[in-house]
């Protein structure tokens, strides 16, 4: 695969602690496009070895608006189905640039390990120093050891190590869109984290045509209904559960994922003045909210915004899905932050908020029907478009994405190709 | 004439960095950009936009702008370690040429989704 690609797949055998590399076959891309199309195909190829597949979409890491998406594809311990969980911020782009479009992690390690994927190399390293540490400390330790604060990390905390059904694979210090208990899978495989860093160059079949078209799309988006807006509060308002006033006093600023026109994340300061402009002296002043559902769950318990965000921070450190914690706390009648914090270890119960399909319910449905939501998610996960942003920008249509994919790769995708792949991955 | 950055509008999406990288490399890469969003202080939510010009290093921080003459004292430490946590330090890259070969002007400006970049 020559364009928009690193042209490599890493196959990592945790049991044997060995990695092999394969080329990304252009015929596979022609048939499956990318992203969830190819992670699903790779899952099926290695199905007998209980794989976790990491991947990026065809347009991830390009100037296509919102091309931020990376994904984890595996069998969910929660639903028993093959599901896809998103990782955004700078994780998707870092995976694309680290030299592999896809990473298959198969088998289990007898001892704690972590993966260090960088510049076309994938190493299995001893993880005994970080096993037992929370997500924040683990991320800090890896970045310090490697001497690079820009390493992007998919990590589990103690929830994953103890194989909780609600364990989440976090991204750096923050919650991800993993609602499938993939953190438990990491824990079962004794895989503490995946560290990614790379400096690849992605070539483009028609560079100027591709960039011109990206610019046109961005121009349309910039005059759309979300122009000038941002943050988790706006998402909640679009969902009909407006928390903007409740959250406002602690907001430091809103942050985008890679090349995403709408900032879907909000950083709140809990131990610092939110209006501070200069660099704080505090090492850990707050939290980046990346999941609106967890926040809404704690608000429903009657907590203040600061209490809710403090709990989100604890959940991320522990590596547990805050949505599950909020729902189970509600059911158990726990409404005080301290008692909720104490319940993280050994949390059990059944959830009603579990996604029923292939794609994480992390992306709100807004006003879409379930069929419309699912198709739009499928498109996002194939092309590598931020799954929330894909729902917010219908003007970024399937036809436009296909046009971009063809300018980028020269492979001649059609709407028939897309329909076929979507049917395949929704099976 | 030069590029002006409003860091209070910036959402740290890196579109400017990738657009600049494309201008340099005719492909998508981040190692040659002369504009970058510093992301090394993630837990503190503190970042700046740094631009290498022909003679200056421009650091647009939320609390204000700093312009350092290239070659001045202190440039190396701040340019390499604090503002610029990258594999290829900004000071080793080509300075901004305002995308002089492009009729529509600088690509970073055109790709900023929140209009944080403008021409001085």
Task: Give residue spans per PLM region.
Chain A
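Protein-protein interaction/assembly regions in multi-subunit complexes
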Residues: 1-179, 183, 188, 192-201, ...
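Extended C-terminal regions of large enzymes
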Residues: 13, 19, 28-31, 68, ...
